[in-house]
């Protein structure tokens, strides 16, 4: 097979569009793009095209937006493209075995973690949430399971102490395309070596929800601090003060300890709002009150000191 592959790309959000952009700058030929149907977005709820569709149209690439691949028509449409390979990145749709078998070389997926550590929908967030030292991307040959296919390439990077899901997303959006292009070179040259996953090492990275992001002050301070970073930019760690929901944008673990009940404010000054937890003290450094942008603790205390007096019990 020649070094240039005929590729069908399947993806939807900005993360996927960055991988498509890398493909468009490579020696490979993107013959078609699959993406989710246009969805209502914004306050006006007008139909909005996914980022992948926008990029494909800019390059005059045919775009397909089936609701599913259940129909024979959708499957035949893909078969008629005569692709060597399908590259799938955050597509948001399950692919049946018939689709996985259609391209000559099958389908590969770029997954936002080091497999098999985190399979599922929220691997970036869960890696921070769990306190992992590193994360990365895994490119795998897709099978019918959930992120269970043989691994073709892994690229890693450290998780820094200040990384949030937002910052890690940006890093992986740069790492992923590089790894993909390297992997495609191996596939085109017949040098790709599939490695089976060890199922015993697998965890499921379940989706996040707003209820999970509510701070439980009985948890360890270190765990709460990781949650603050993992749940940024969504759903945002939060708690209640003076019957208002307060979002936490930045925090750190204090060196000091406290014997006060979990959730008690033990210190409040320009260095932060210090809150006793189940183990250790958490320092709140940047907060967002309803109707306002995120603010430093000093600005918060200048305007709402009564909400955060020492001895106040946060819930």
Curated annotation (Swiss-Prot):
Q: What class of enzyme is it?
A: transferase
CDD domains from the xrefs? FMT_core_Met-tRNA-FMT_N, Met_tRNA_FMT_C
What's the EC number here?
A: 2.1.2.9
Which Pfam families would you find in this protein's record? Answer: Formyl_trans_C, Formyl_trans_N
Which catalytic reaction applies to this protein?
Answer: L-methionyl-tRNA(fMet) + (6R)-10-formyltetrahydrofolate = N-formyl-L-methionyl-tRNA(fMet) + (6S)-5,6,7,8-tetrahydrofolate + H(+)
One CC-aspect GO term: cytosol
Q: Where does (6S)-5,6,7,8-tetrahydrofolate bind?
A: 113-116
Q: Report disulfide bridges, numbered on this chain.
A: none
Gene name tied to this protein: fmt
Q: What does this protein do?
A: Attaches a formyl group to the free amino group of methionyl-tRNA(fMet). The formyl group appears to play a dual role in the initiator identity of N-formylmethionyl-tRNA by promoting its recognition by IF2 and preventing the misappropriation of this tRNA by the elongation apparatus.
Family according to the record? Belongs to the Fmt family.
Keyword entries, A-Z? Protein biosynthesis, Transferase
Please give the organism: Vibrio parahaemolyticus serotype O3:K6 (strain RIMD 2210633)
Name listed for the protein in its UniProt record: Methionyl-tRNA formyltransferase
Q: Which NCBIfam families match?
A: fmt
This entry's Gene Ontology molecular function terms read: methionyl-tRNA formyltransferase activity
